[in-house]
Design a protein with these regions (language model features):
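Short proline/glycine-enriched turn/loop motifs at strand-loop junctions of beta-rich domains
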Residues: 394-398, 442-447, 513-519
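Surface-exposed, glycine-biased beta-strand/turn segments
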Residues: 25-107, 116-119, 134-143, 148-149, ...
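Short edge beta-strand/loop segments characteristic of extracellular beta-sandwich folds
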Residues: 244-248, 435-439, 507-513
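Proline-centered linker/hinge motifs at extracellular inter-domain junctions
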Residues: 192-198, 486-490, 581
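Proteolytic processing hotspots in large secreted/extracellular or virion-associated proteins
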Residues: 364-365, 372-377, 404-451, 496-498
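Long, low-complexity serine/threonine/glycine- and acidic-rich segments characteristic of extracellular
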Residues: 118, 148, 190, 203-208, ...
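Proteolytic-maturation and junctional protease-sensitive modules
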Residues: 424-480, 520-522, 529-530
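Short beta-strand segments of immunoglobulin-like
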Residues: 228-235, 423-425, 494-501
Length: 600
């Protein structure tokens, strides 16, 4: 591994070098995929609330979100013939989902389901009981659960990380697992509306993108395309530069703003760089933080998408015609710049303007030249008396100037100083290792009760001891302090009394709390495992079923936290048929009408 001082590691670009096919549109990628093979996975017309490649925190959206009229339990059907190859139940993610393999080498995924079709639901329930786990992943062979195109495979829902009823639908390459843009397969979605261009951003690429605030230009739609108002010639003091775009895609008949598919930039008619969101793997998805201006986004200013790649943007969405995809101005003549932004249906919007170098304007504040700068593509090591950080080669996307501070921790259970290394407005790709040396002697019985808190409770890391140091992996810069946690979790009571009366209830809900976070939850009813769901994160829920018949029962709940503190509580409860009391209806007496005296 190398440890170096150079701003750009040339090898970092080797994964980006792809030649352009000048005579063909990149959006003609749809010809690579079978057209009309996959049908609508719903029995209502397809309407998109989100498309492939949409920008999300730390990932691109990997499929289509299909509206279900803001309702649950619509039939979800197989998009083509095949067999169920995998099911999963993932809290705060896909929820209940199905993967179907098809004979043409592709797979489809259907997520946020309320339930599977009856035969599959019954089988999964048996496996959950066998494994004593609600969250589960199961693989199947070709002969287990075959499906036909249009066969109902489940009901739509709002499970997992879903924020409202809808169906998440993906098409994948079965062999590689790459998620593919479903709109390239001729899905029945009408679209003749080009993207809307909002803002253009310009960067000085002689320095790190993290060391500057981009120059912003509002865009205006005009005859023949978009323009930068009142600026026929854009003059700049940058002779090596790049652009980013804020743009959204639109579909007919909806006001939704969706993600764009591609953006490309030309200098004097030569294509310099582009990105295309046609295929992405989940392992590549976090590279979105290299495609956007991450610091601009973290400041709450929205998304800007880089048209040219950052030095260590190793994802495969970029294509460049030179070593780095950057604009170079070697003279003071005006140069024609064209930017095209398109969707997956070949609807394009275009910006044309002249770009001219003029010395002495747009002066950037350079990054201080230092051997201590964090350089992408190299191992970077940061060392202080009681704090260290180790950044692997694939940790960062552009040069970062480290800023560090140390202060006394104020939390009563702190066992180290508070260490601040940059802040979380700088993205981290591959996790870095941080090490902290405690400032106090740790009791032997407390050594396994230590957590490292990042950013005032935003995340808790479980460290391991390395001699006198605590070591942990982290996916973000920020503040770090070591804390001791000897307080066990707290568990709420399901009701009052020695024998809780749950006859009026339809379910039992526990929402345990803890200083370091809940690691495990287990419930037993009359000595047997009882399945609680944990779909949305904090609460564990059991809906009464055949496992809990009417009568008196014994319930035991055991909760463990991140460092191994355990709380166990038991209750007796009773449950009998219950009829809610009838509401009393009060009849209002009609006011008597007094006779009206006639005037004499």
């Amino acid at each position: 591994m190398n440890k170096g001082k150079f701003y750009i590691r040339q090898a970092a670009f080797s994964l980006l070098l792809l030649s352009f096919l000048n005579a063909e549109s990149q959006t003609a990628a749809s010809t690579k995929y079978p057209q009309g093979y996959f049908g609508n996975p719903l029995r209502i017309p397809m309407s998109l609330s989100a498309n492939f490649g949409e920008l999300r925190p730390n990932h691109w959206h990997m499929g289509l979100d299909l509206r279900t009229d803001q309702k649950e339990n619509y039939p979800v059907v197989a998009s083509a013939d095949g067999y169920v190859s995998h099911i999963g139940i993932r809290p705060s993610s896909f929820g209940k989902f199905i993967i179907v393999n098809h004979p043409n080498g592709y797979s489809t995924l259907y997520a946020h389901l309320n339930r599977f079709y009856p035969e599959l639901e019954k089988y999964v329930r048996e496996k959950q009981k066998e494994k004593e786990s609600w969250a589960i992943e199961l693989d199947f062979s070709e002969d287990d659960f075959k499906v036909k195109k249009g066969k109902e495979i489940g009901k739509s829902g709002n499970t997992g990380g879903s924020q409202g009823p809808h169906l998440h639908f993906e098409i994948r390459d079965t062999e590689t697992g790459r998620s593919l843009n479903p709109l390239l397969f001729g899905m029945p979605v009408h679209d003749n509306v080009p993207p809307v261009l909002i803002k253009l951003a310009m960067y000085d690429r002689s320095i790190s993108t993290y060391a500057q605030t981009p120059k912003l230009f509002a865009l205006k739609k005009a005859a023949g395309g978009y323009i930068i108002p009142k600026m026929p010639v854009l003059k700049t003091g940058f002779n090596i530069l790049s652009f980013a775009i804020r743009a959204v895609d639109k579909f007919p008949g909806t006001q939704n703003s969706n993600g764009i598919y591609t953006a490309r930039i030309f200098q004097d008619e030569e294509r310099i760089a582009e990105f295309v969101l046609d295929e992405i793997t989940y392992s590549e998805s976090e590279f979105i933080n290299a495609q956007i201006d991450y610091r601009f986004y973290k400041a709450g200013r929205g998304y800007l998408q880089h048209i040219s790649p950052l030095p260590a943007a190793r994802g495969k969405i970029y294509h460049v015609s030179n070593d780095d995809g950057l604009i170079r101005l070697a003279d003071t003549f005006p140069h024609k710049i064209t930017i095209q932004v398109g969707d997956a249906n070949d609807n394009f919007s275009t910006i044309n303007f002249l770009l001219q170098f003029q010395d002495g304007i747009d002066i950037s504040r350079p990054v201080r030249s230092s051997d201590k700068n964090f350089i992408p593509g190299y191992v970077n090591i940061f060392e202080k008396t009681d704090f260290e950080a180790y950044l692997p080669e694939a940790c960062i996307y552009d040069t970062i100037q480290p800023i560090y501070s140390r202060s006394d921790a104020t939390l009563p259970n702190a066992v180290s100083a508070l260490h601040q290394l940059k802040d979380n407005s700088y993205p981290v790709h591959e996790e870095m290792t941080i090490k902290i040396k405690p400032t106090v002697q740790i009791k032997q019985e407390w050594r396994d009760k230590i957590v490292i808190q990042r950013n005032a409770g935003n995340a808790l890391l479980k460290p391991v001891w390395q001699g006198e140091w605590l070591s942990a992996k982290t996916g973000a810069f920020g503040s770090f302090v070591a804390l001791v946690d000897v307080t066990p979790p707290q568990i709420n009571n399901p009701g009052k009394g020695d024998t809780v009366d749950l006859s009026p209830a339809s379910r039992i809900v526990f929402t345990p709390t803890d200083n370091s976070g809940i690691k495990s939850f287990r419930a037993e009813l009359d000595g047997s495992w009882l399945m609680f769901t944990n779909d949305k994160g904090r609460s564990w829920i059991y809906n009464f079923d055949e496992q809990c018949p009417y009568g008196v029962h014994h319930l035991k709940v055991r909760v463990a936290d991140l460092v191994g503190n355990i709380t166990e509580k038991t209750w007796w409860f009773k449950r009998y048929p219950y009829t809610p009391p009838k509401k009393k209806i009060y009849n209002k007496k009609k006011a008597s009408k007094k006779p009206v005296k006639k005037k004499k």
